[in-house]
Amino acid sequence: MTKSLPKDFIFGGATAAYQAEGATHTDGKGPVAWDKYLEDNYWYTAEPASDFYHKYPVDLKLAEEYGVNGIRISIAWSRIFPTGYGEVNPKGVEFYHNLFAECHKRHVEPFVTLHHFDTPEALHSNGDFLNRDNIEHFVDYAAFCFEEFPEVRYWTTFNEIGPIGDGQYLVGKFPPGIQYDLAKVFQSHHNMMVSHARAVKLYKDKGYKGEIGVVHALPTKYPYDPENPADVRAAELEDIIHNKFILDATYLGHYSDVTLAGVNHILKVNGGQLDLRDEDFAALEAAKDLNDFLGINYYMSDWMRDFDGETEIIHNGKGEKGSSKYQIKGVGRRESPTHIPKTDWDWIIYPQGLYDQIMRIKKDYPNYKKIYITENGLGYKDEFVDNTVYDDARIDYVKQHLEVLSDAIADGANVKGYFIWSLMDVFSWSNGYEKRYGLFYVDFETQERYPKKSAHWYRRLAETQMIE
């Protein structure tokens, strides 16, 4: 049976400032930690990326032509405040006014994120969100943007608080490249959630007319053997690290006893302690019912096995299938069932995980109000032939996830939109330019755009709301 989506559904495309804009030092933009980190550690940089800084009229025209009626955009904090605070860069402000005006001209609703992995270097080198001073700087930056850009009706504070802490302090593939420091992971999560809560409260106190929420990456965690209590425990602990800790902060305003017990166990085994203050919980409590929506980024699920050994994580950044490894002392190790497909980057393709995660939110956090799927898509080594890409695998991936999304809506979840990652091909943080996600192929040499087969399929989807 062909499944469908609601008439008022947003069919969106997602981007991010640093991954799309290029122009990393143009018109007064301040540096971010990624600039030097990529030069020192990787075989690529974010220059020129998709040159969205200059090409956004082209991309938004394509969006309109292909039925995309929403776009995720992030503001580069260091375009507005080159050092993260203090003097405003007027050219950065002007750019975003022009960008949002073009969105509305093209009838593509902008969903705007304040922070997408790109803290200004001056603040990042001073501890990023481990430094509580940067909570204040973020709230000041948010306050400026809320006041300056009334044309924005949908705001999100952060993109993927979980993967920021993981990337910076656990896997070590984000600057500053620290590995296996679980205390820093949790402290980063916590301080960013406090920053989120304070920005949301400020937005509501000021009486702005739009909506505000947060985008969380929520990979669903399963026990490898559901009959084995040790595997079940491993999945629970892994879920606390990546999902439950930040969801509790978002919607409970505190950490449940189960969550705190799990965190304390992990830190007892791995070392470290957290700085959790009364004023932090006052901020979380004040904002827990003020979020207008939750953005869910979902790409994959994980299966966990019991593990008794030392932490070791190997990141598959080059698309060499089977080269990744993930095991955490006192938590567990990832091992996927052999019958479940995965990408060349070892990302497990499991649409049911999206359904399960949505229904988990509905059950455990009933004050969620509404959900947007703010990222979902297939990274692939696209083959450019005849001025297009015949990306049937991407179409199949998106179709399967939209079908379970339709099921979740039928089962009572309030899901209002879907943003494919990504609108056009962009640069990937730890994979460079080989891993493509876009509806539109970007020739990174010429910056020409070419619709892929998936773009034509997505247009039909948006026109009919039928998942075919």
UniProtKB/Swiss-Prot annotation:
Keyword Hydrolase carried by entry: yes
GO cellular component, one term: cytosol
Entry EC no(s): 3.2.1.85
Protein species of origin: Streptococcus gordonii (strain Challis / ATCC 35105 / BCRC 15272 / CH1 / DL1 / V288)
Enzyme class, first EC level, given as a word: hydrolase
Protein name according to UniProt: 6-phospho-beta-galactosidase
Phylogenetic placement of the source organism: Bacteria, Bacillati, Bacillota, Bacilli, Lactobacillales
One annotated GO molecular function: beta-glucosidase activity
PANTHER family: GLYCOSYL HYDROLASE (PTHR10353), LP05116P (PTHR10353:SF36)
Catalytic residues (positions): 160, 375
Binding, D-galactose 6-phosphate: 19, 116, 159-160, 297, 428-429, 435, 437
SUPFAM superfamilies: (Trans)glycosidases
